Amino acid sequence: MHRMLTAAAAAALALTLAPATARAEALFWSTQAKPVEESQAMREQVLAGFEGGVDYQGMDNGPWLTRIQAEMQAGTGTIAVLGGLHGDLSGLEAGLVDLSGADTAGIAPATLELGRLGTDEQKYVPWMQATYLMAANRKALEHLPEGADLNALTYDQLIAWATALNEATGGPKLGFPAGPQGLKHRFFQGFLLPAYTGSTVTQFRSAEAETAWEAFKTLWAQTNPASANYGFMQEPLLTEEVWVAFDHVARLGDAFNQRPDDFVAFPAPAGPKGRAFMPVIAGVAVMSTAPDMDQSMALVNYMLKPETQVATLRATNFFPVKDIPLPDDMPASVKAFGPAIAAMTGAPDALPALLPMGLGEMGGQFNQIYTDTFEQIVLGGRPVRDTLDAQAEALRALMVETGAPCWAPDAPSDGPCPVE
């Protein structure tokens, strides 16, 4: 037994010392670009130019986090660079090195600030971004309310537009991803509620939230009833079941790529508190246990090069975090979405509402509260006030159980994010 242990220890030591003799491929440990085709594109199109090679591993959050925690606990590891959403990296800051030396020129200051994770160090560097947008068939534009600016719509104008479309065409032409695979919860968390309340969590049961849900009920009355089954809005846009839709950019792309002349993209509407939107920010970070710090820093800077940012866009449909010109041969969807994202993130009333964070394995239950609220109020016809009061208690209990502090646009909290 002793001999076996000694052999195992020797083998482990040999693995540990291997980089000293021949620099190993950099292990890029990521929650992003998980599908087989995206991981392959990352390896072959994005990372192939990195000297020494990269072993890109995209995986689910559970195993991703388990290995990170094991390496942090051991004080030694093999991961060169972490890739993850803002919420994935939040909470790991104690084990991450300062990346202030990275080449971050061209990244918006507000986006860069997110990477500090509440510290005075650059704990991650923004790597790529996506968001959700509105899309419309050009045929719908002639029915826009008088004086409405497509790039600066309000929710009231969207309701008026949807109503006009219904009347002009003899059926509802607004579509919404409210099916089982749809991202409806992100609309409520990142768009509707913050636009009316300036909050995702704290003001969940407020009078302003009541107004938001009443407005959405009015909007739903002008929405194609098949929306209760929609997952990816590019499909009903292409069949013209709907003429106007909201969805994640990755779920709208096919419509623009197949029929580039027929569709336009534009920012989400604004409510009384601003033009709320949910930026999906992915970042790269380096653990203090990285086996070769020079290699890790080189890979971080490689990910920020303009040509790498463009290659990442081609591979993942995530947009550059740097303000760089895009090549002429980009897909039609990219050409349409780029200006719309810029108009939304740069709007004078822009109100970023981050993805939920600090919830760990309870993220699904958090999302379910927003989905249940929608289903009870909008589909089930339950009174708004009664529903909000009941769901607010479920939300408060979940925040207390997870201990998750508030995230933007809610004000920072010392303990669990309060539900007033």
Where are these regions (language model features)?
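Short, solvent-exposed loop/beta-turn-alpha elements that line the ligand-binding surface or hinge
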Residues: S100-I107, N151, L174, L193-W213, ...
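A bilobed periplasmic-binding-protein/Venus flytrap-type ligand-binding module shared by bacterial periplasmic
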Residues: M134-K139, Y196, P279-M293, A311
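Extracytoplasmic/periplasmic substrate-binding proteins
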Residues: F187, E214-Q295
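Extracytoplasmic "Venus flytrap"/periplasmic binding protein-like
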Residues: A26, E44-I107, E142-P145, W243-V244, ...
